Amino acid sequence: AEGAWIAWYAAKENLDGYLRWALNSWTIEPLLDSRFYTWGAGDTYLLYPGGRTCLRFENLVAGIQAYEKIRILKTELQTQNKTATLRKLERVLESFDELQLLKTPANVVVEKANLFINGL
């Protein structure tokens, strides 16, 4: 869920981008062995040969979609002067804090936040 979490964090910090260092830095046999020296298995790529996807990529896509939804919601809530709902959204975004990850897993934070924005 870290791929989705980072997009929510970007929304919280009002960032307009995210740099992912590797998209397809494949090993010799990426479909058989995704280990890459000192990095975790699969960490060096989000797409596999032949256009295959992976959970890391799917989570990143979900996060990007949430980021865009948050951006649109913020604009609409400001335009409609729905300050109470906007404050609730800001409080949800505040839960995306690196130190919070020590206590609450990323997937739990993302799931709660998705429930909130999908209910608006």
Give residue spans per PLM region.
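Catalytic-core region of carbohydrate-active enzymes that cleave or remodel glycosidic bonds
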Residues: 1-39
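Catalytic domains of carbohydrate-active enzymes that cleave complex glycans
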Residues: 15-16, 31-120
